[in-house]
């Protein structure tokens, strides 16, 4: 799956706690290295969207000022 595919899956989730549960599940079940990298990128992107108040950004377009709030 691509980063966009994972991001669309993660956008169905509106809380950081639920996002972490899905992230842990996928991290445990995925075996392909490229899928894992794409999933990590999408999860980080969704974390940034959630801490910015739910504002949606295109892949790779999250402002640098938002990243300081992502844990």
Swiss-Prot record:
What assembly does the database describe for this protein? Forms complexes with both H-NS and StpA.
Keywords linked to the UniProt accession: DNA-binding, Transcription, Transcription regulation
User: So what family is this one in?
Assistant: Belongs to the Hha/YmoA/Cnu family.
User: Mind telling me what this protein is named?
Assistant: Transcription modulator YdgT
Source domain of life is Bacteria
One of its Pfam families is HHA
Which InterPro entries does the UniProt record give?
A: Hemolysn_expr_modulating_HHA, HHA_sf
* A GO term, aspect molecular function: DNA binding
Q: Where are the transmembrane segments?
A: none
Site feature (Interacts with H-NS) residues: 44
Relate the protein's function as given in its record. Answer: Binds to H-NS and modified the range of genes it silences; H-NS alonge silences core gene while the H-NS-Hha complex (and presumably also H-NS-YdgT) silences genes acquired by horizontal gene transfer. Plays a role silencing virulence factors in the absence of factors that induce pathogenicity. The complex formed with H-NS binds to the specific 26-bp cnb site in the origin of replication oriC.
